[in-house]
Structure formats: structure tokens, C-alpha cells
Design a protein with these regions (language model features):
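Short, flexible helix-loop junctions that flank or precede catalytic/ligand sites
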Residues: 1-252
């Protein structure tokens, strides 16, 4: 078993949410908000950590990481989970953080959310934003809503993410899951294409810039049901963030 796979198994078995690796430190996992050392592992040197990370990285992605010092991608370990990976370069050497993504999408009914949330899956058009800080469950909530649509309606659903997190299987709906940097140049390019691809539902992984926000609003105005995420706290802050993304002359 690859040593990275050992760490992924440990993360899942100990109900952790994130795995942190950094040169000069022992591996740690986040459990209920606190970072805990991984049992049986000692401090990782820069060279040892590079060797670990190389185990799960394609030649092309590794070349990008060596050149740019940052890399985002998703990695799947069958029977365990998928992992959202971020490689980085820092003052003391290399580092990486992995967020665990469950292999199976949790049904909306099992998330103990308000009943009103389920009604979002039955909307025909509009813009729905799921907001909150990192780790608050935005992706899990959206995956459950999209899965509800998939089980209920015959729709064309386009997801645009960086990277793709939850993998959806075609049930009643048909999916086009696109990864920024792999399947499309940018969120904006994929959104423009989705409008031309007869998309009924569009999931935007992150409303990160003016172009993405503007195109998402346009897609909703044209009849699509658009879901997206923002790192904000509360509805009022979300409205402010959306408005502030536009130039002053367009905010009125």
C-alpha cells in the first residue's frame, strides 16, 4: 500500500475532516476542529514529503506544482473516499492539505436540515447561494440538493468545479461534470458554454470573481436554476458581497 494511502485510511478511520502535511512536522489530521498527530508517524523531511506527494500526482500536475508552487486537484481512493488536494510551497519546504469527500452522497433527508432546504430542489429557475466559512458543509449540502434533483427530475445538470468533488451518476438526470483547468479554461468559459448547452441546472463550485457572478446571474435570468457557493456569514453579507463585486457604476 502506498504510504499516502495509509494516511488516507487513517484520516477516514479516525473520522477526520482534513489531513495536514508539512516539511519539518509530523502528519496531522483535523478531528472536531482540533489538529491531532497521526499515530506511528514521525517528522517529515522536505525530501520525504516530496516523495509522498509524488505517489498520487500525475506527471503533468507534478510539473505544474514544481513550476508554480501551488496545485489543486481531486484524488479518489476506491472503497475509501475522494480527497480534495492542495499542494503548496512554503518557507520551510513543501506542504499539502487534503479534505475528505465522502464516496457516497449523503441524502438530503439525512442531513437534518430545515424542510425548506428540500424545496430548493424543486425550483425551476433562479440563483441559489449556499454560504458559510470553510468546512461548514456547503459542498455536502449542494451535493445533496443536486442528488435530490437527479432522483426526481429529468434534467440536464452541468457542474463546474475546481476540482470536481462529489461525482454524480446519471439517474433520472443527465450530468456534464466539468473541472476547471482540465475540461474547461475557467468558470466563466464553462458558464458561457453551459448557457449554450441547454442546461436546466448549473452548479458553480465557487463564485470567485465578477465574471463568474455576472454570468451566473445571466444564466438564471435566461431560465436556468443556478447553484453556487460564497464564503460569507449570513444573507446580508452575501448580498453585499455580490453587489461589491460589480463596478460602482453598475451597483445602483
Amino acid at each position: 500500500m502506498a504510504r499516502m494511502h495509509e494516511l488516507f485510511h487513517y484520516l477516514k478511520d479516525n473520522k477526520g475532516s482534513d489531513l495536514h502535511l508539512a516539511a519539518g512536522l509530523e502528519p496531522r489530521i483535523r478531528v472536531h476542529g482540533s489538529l491531532e498527530s497521526v499515530a506511528g508517524w514521525s517528522t517529515l523531511t522536505h525530501e520525504a514529503l516530496l516523495s509522498l506527494l509524488r505517489e498520487i500526482c500525475s506527471e503533468e500536475d507534478w510539473a505544474d506544482y514544481m513550476k508554480c508552487g501551488d496545485l489543486d486537484f481531486a484524488y479518489g481512493l476506491p472503497g475509501v473516499a475522494r480527497f480534495r488536494a492542495n499542494f503548496l510551497r512554503q518557507e520551510n519546504g513543501c506542504g499539502a492539505v487534503f479534505r475528505i469527500i465522502p464516496e457516497k452522497i449523503i441524502p438530503l433527508e439525512d442531513l437534518n436540515l430545515p424542510k425548506a432546504i428540500e424545496s430548493l430542489a424543486h425550483l425551476q429557475q433562479g440563483l441559489v447561494l449556499v454560504t458559510g466559512p470553510t468546512g461548514s458543509g456547503k459542498s455536502t449540502t449542494l451535493a445533496a440538493i443536486i442528488d435530490k434533483i437527479n432522483n426526481t427530475y429529468e434534467k440536464h445538470i452541468v457542474t463546474i468545479e475546481d476540482p470536481v468533488e462529489f461525482v454524480h451518476k446519471n439517474k433520472k438526470s443527465v450530468f456534464s461534470q466539468r473541472e476547471v483547468g482540465e475540461d474547461t479554461e475557467s468558470f466563466g468559459a464553462a458558464l458561457r458554454a453551459a448557457i449554450r448547452q441547454d442546461a436546466d441546472v448549473i452548479l458553480v463550485g465557487e463564485m470567485r470573481d465578477l465574471e463568474t457572478i455576472s454570468l451566473a446571474v445571466t444564466a438564471a435570468e435566461m431560465g436556468a436554476l443556478v447553484f453556487g457557493t460564497l464564503h460569507t456569514n449570513g444573507a446580508a453579507n452575501t448580498i453585499d458581497r455580490l453587489i461589491d463585486a460589480f463596478p460602482a457604476e453598475e451597483q445602483a
